[in-house]
């Protein structure tokens, strides 16, 4: 389908039409429209840097994981684009029931507002992961496997990290023992898969751990964990104020670490119907003051109504509770 045959505004309108409907109502776009979203967004990702340099004011969101109606709630809170600038930190697909609507709306907004709307790559924007955790099955059930491969081509071109006003460093996972200079990120060529180890892997997979010093192995079996000393040294070396990342369920939707030098954001409330966590979005104003907007979890009793539909897939382990 040629670009001029695709009505982007109509795609966005249909994706937003289900606002106010019962959560779970699907939007079935044409396959040709989804292909357009993937190929056009991929062109834009490639034309922009792999390490984005962004300006405040901006709103930052963590994992969404196919919880489409919660994504719509985030926009209701923060303002639908272009009312506010947005940066999403990855993990749009898998685990939730509506990965397709979620990723399609995000790609549509990227195409419509390329300089105001930004999406980073999470560890689930990777074929070997989303083949297993739900996105492949959703594509196969609702469309076909070829379309899943088209998404893979798009995901392989997503940017990896962003710096806001030279002071806030953002990525999906965390720091890497291999990261000495920002130039190393800029040198990564796209399209690329996520390797099993090294800089790119760590930026999407690593986790902070308050109980360690330096670097340690990660319970996920991938990448590392890093202590507060690593965070402090990194910020001092690069003259930055804050690391903002996602990748872990946190009870309040956001959680500080290392004397407020790092914050974890998670934007999928009642994650998978199996947690009672809130979701959060971080607003960064022009003076780089950070505030949080919270999506409260549903009442506990609802959890058992909706949670009965568990997919049986293993869940991202929650952060260790404070002793």
UniProtKB/Swiss-Prot annotation:
Its cofactor is Mn(2+). It comes from Emericella nidulans (strain FGSC A4 / ATCC 38163 / CBS 112.46 / NRRL 194 / M139) (Aspergillus nidulans). Gene3D superfamilies: 3.60.21.10. SUPFAM superfamilies: Metallo-dependent phosphatases. GO terms for molecular function: metal ion binding; protein serine/threonine phosphatase activity. The active site is at residue 124. The keyword Cell division applies. Plays an important role in the control of mitosis by reversing the action of the nimA kinase. It catalyses: O-phospho-L-seryl-[protein] + H2O = L-seryl-[protein] + phosphate; O-phospho-L-threonyl-[protein] + H2O = L-threonyl-[protein] + phosphate. Binds 2 manganese ions per subunit. This is Serine/threonine-protein phosphatase PP1. Its EC number is 3.1.3.16. One of its GO terms (cellular component) is cytoplasm.
């Amino acid at each position: 389908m040629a670009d001029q045959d695709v009505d982007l505004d109509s795609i966005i309108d249909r994706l937003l039409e289900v606002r106010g409907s019962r959560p779970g109502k699907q939007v079935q776009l044409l396959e040709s429209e989804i292909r357009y979203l993937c190929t056009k967004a991929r062109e834009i990702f490639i034309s922009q840097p792999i390490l984005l340099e962004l300006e405040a004011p901006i709103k930052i969101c963590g994992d969404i994981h196919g919880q489409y109606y919660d994504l719509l709630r985030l926009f209701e809170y923060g303002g639908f684009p272009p009312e506010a600038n947005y940066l999403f930190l990855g993990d749009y697909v898998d685990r939730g029931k509506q990965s397709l609507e979620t990723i399609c709306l995000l790609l549509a907004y990227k195409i419509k507002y390329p300089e105001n709307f930004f999406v980073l790559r999470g560890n689930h924007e990777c074929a070997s992961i989303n083949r297993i955790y739900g996105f492949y099955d959703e594509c196969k059930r609702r469309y076909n496997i070829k379309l899943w491969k088209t998404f893979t081509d798009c995901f392989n071109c997503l940017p990896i990290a962003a710096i806001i006003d030279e002071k806030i460093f953002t990525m999906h996972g965390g720091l890497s023992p291999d990261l000495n200079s920002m130039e190393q990120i800029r040198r990564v060529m796209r399209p690329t898969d996520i390797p099993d180890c090294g800089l790119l892997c760590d930026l999407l997979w690593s986790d902070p751990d308050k109980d360690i010093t330096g670097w340690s192995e990660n319970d996920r079996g991938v990448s590392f964990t890093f202590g507060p000393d690593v965070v402090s040294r990194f910020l001092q070396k690069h003259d930055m104020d804050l690391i903002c990342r996602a990748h872990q369920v946190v009870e309040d939707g956001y959680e500080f670490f290392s004397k407020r030098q790092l914050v974890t954001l998670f934007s999928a409330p009642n994650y998978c119907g199996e947690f009672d966590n809130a979701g959060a979005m971080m607003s960064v104003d022009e003076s780089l003051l950070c505030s949080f907007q919270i999506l409260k979890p549903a009442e506990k009793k609802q959890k058992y109504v909706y949670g009965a539909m568990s997919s049986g897939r293993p869940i991202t382990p929650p952060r260790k509770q404070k002793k």
